[in-house]
Swiss-Prot record:
GO terms for cellular component: cytoplasm. It is found in: Cytoplasm. Involved in nitrogen metabolism via ammonium assimilation. Catalyzes the ATP-dependent biosynthesis of glutamine from glutamate and ammonia. Oligomer of 12 subunits arranged in the form of two hexagons. The lineage of its organism: Bacteria, Bacillati, Cyanobacteriota, Cyanophyceae, Oscillatoriophycideae. Its cofactor is Mg(2+). One of its GO terms (molecular function) is glutamine synthetase activity. The activity of this enzyme could be controlled by adenylation under conditions of abundant glutamine. It comes from Phormidium lapideum. The keyword Ligase applies. This is Glutamine synthetase. Binds 2 Mg(2+) ions per subunit.
Length: 23
């Protein structure tokens, strides 16, 4: 896995967490 892939996964997880918090 490349650093870019790791960052993209972290961003996806972060967006999901934010969505759950605001819902």
């Amino acid at each position: 896995t490349t650093p870019q892939e790791v960052l993209s996964r972290i961003k996806d997880q972060g967006i999901k967490l934010i969505d759950l918090k605001f819902i």
